[in-house]
Amino acid sequence: MESLKSKKLFAEAKKVIPGGVNSPVRACLSVGCDPLFIERAEGSYIYDADGQKYLDFVNSWGPMIMGHAHPDIIKAIQDAAVYGTSYGAPTSSEVDLASMVVEAVPSIEKVRFVSSGTEATMSAVRLARGYTGKNVIVKFDGCYHGHADSFLVKAGSGVLTLGIPGSPGVPEDIVKNTISIPYNSVEALETTLRDADLNIACVIVEPVAGNMGCVPPAPGFLQKLREITAEEGIVLIFDEVITGFRLSYGGAQQYYGVTPDLTCLGKIIGGGLPVGAYGGKADIMNSVAPDGPVYQAGTLSGNPLAMAAGKAALKLLQQDGFYEDLNQKSAAYADGLLEVAGRVGLPMQLNRVGSVMTSFFTATPVTDFETAMKADTGLYGRHYRQMLDSGIYLAPSQFECSFMSSTHSDADLKRALLETEKSFSLLKNA
């Protein structure tokens, strides 16, 4: 399918928006085509500017776990908007949503809302530094925690997709306080975190890496990370912007049984509206202004529309069997993808945790940044374009995840597997 209106809109956008997009990976540079411009979405489908329909496995990069335009969420937003879109003052809805988050997430005793995942991670790191009086942060190769200066070191997501080693504009004085070590390496944990001379304030980690593709934690990795950070007095931060309320109602920390000191959230907790949050132990969170000296603020923090959408979303997730059904559906689809790849004879590794997955075009198991980089990005680009022509919308990067929603039907998944087999056969025989 060709979207002529999308091509025209992209040309117009490039005149007034850098690269024609407001987030780099959307430009589709790594998959060799122009981006679709989306006009509307409903359930498991999105519709482009020409009105063409696509089965969506991106789901706004994760937030749409109940599918697009869920009527309960839309109604909550509409009902809230009648009373005004922003007050810059406290509201009852932010107290309600905060209470729901505290009840759900094991590590969170107090929570502060912000307007994006980047704000959440940036604020959590500042808080950890202020609380400990130390400066150095440790992250993991290929993990992405937003575009704050401290995180643009061996980062994932669009930084990895576009092959950018770092970013101009980030001073060396900032980067020198960030240490990046291999994900899933217990040896690196021991060597780095036990070194008292490094002055480490915190470790920030995606408990399931989701920005070099889906890379699950090796058995015992998160447990060892928790053990060492606790022994060394280092604040452990889980970046659950992707995994929060996605893997389970209590996030990855509930799923794996590992409780960090601080947690960053986003995506699902806003029901699809711009939102972020960071929270954790009360004694740490009490260091945030106005209770404490660590400053953080935001004009639109706790926006009433986002709070209303978030409350509606979390209520839906509380339905009996929601996660069991979603994860069973995801497992069946993943098994189908592996079966198709095996039947066609195309080398592929599929990593999945719950309803998050990535198909890597490589014969090598993907367990970290180094092995993720062995994936054939050119092959993925061809697969992406072939699937798009068939009306299937995948992430426009080998190093991003596919997300399942509760609205993906058996018929949807059967069709997706059929089109995948056609695409894989073309790739194999090319």
Swiss-Prot record:
<comment type="similarity">
    <text>Belongs to the class-III pyridoxal-phosphate-dependent aminotransferase family. HemL subfamily.</text>
</comment>
<dbReference type="GO" id="GO:0030170">
    <property type="term" value="F:pyridoxal phosphate binding"/>
</dbReference>
<dbReference type="Pfam" id="PF00202">
    <property type="entry name" value="Aminotran_3"/>
</dbReference>
<dbReference type="GO" id="GO:0008483">
    <property type="term" value="F:transaminase activity"/>
</dbReference>
<protein>
    <recommendedName>
        <fullName>Glutamate-1-semialdehyde 2,1-aminomutase</fullName>
        <ecNumber>5.4.3.8</ecNumber>
    </recommendedName>
</protein>
<dbReference type="GO" id="GO:0005737">
    <property type="term" value="C:cytoplasm"/>
</dbReference>
<keyword id="KW-0627">Porphyrin biosynthesis</keyword>
<keyword id="KW-0663">Pyridoxal phosphate</keyword>
<dbReference type="InterPro" id="IPR005814">
    <property type="entry name" value="Aminotrans_3"/>
</dbReference>
<comment type="pathway">
    <text>Porphyrin-containing compound metabolism; protoporphyrin-IX biosynthesis; 5-aminolevulinate from L-glutamyl-tRNA(Glu): step 2/2.</text>
</comment>
<dbReference type="InterPro" id="IPR015424">
    <property type="entry name" value="PyrdxlP-dep_Trfase"/>
</dbReference>
<comment type="subunit">
    <text>Homodimer.</text>
</comment>
<feature type="modified residue" description="N6-(pyridoxal phosphate)lysine">
    <location>
        <position position="267"/>
    </location>
</feature>
<dbReference type="InterPro" id="IPR049704">
    <property type="entry name" value="Aminotrans_3_PPA_site"/>
</dbReference>
<dbReference type="InterPro" id="IPR015421">
    <property type="entry name" value="PyrdxlP-dep_Trfase_major"/>
</dbReference>
<dbReference type="InterPro" id="IPR015422">
    <property type="entry name" value="PyrdxlP-dep_Trfase_small"/>
</dbReference>
<dbReference type="InterPro" id="IPR004639">
    <property type="entry name" value="4pyrrol_synth_GluAld_NH2Trfase"/>
</dbReference>
<keyword id="KW-0413">Isomerase</keyword>
<dbReference type="GO" id="GO:0042286">
    <property type="term" value="F:glutamate-1-semialdehyde 2,1-aminomutase activity"/>
</dbReference>
<keyword id="KW-0963">Cytoplasm</keyword>
<dbReference type="GO" id="GO:0006782">
    <property type="term" value="P:protoporphyrinogen IX biosynthetic process"/>
</dbReference>
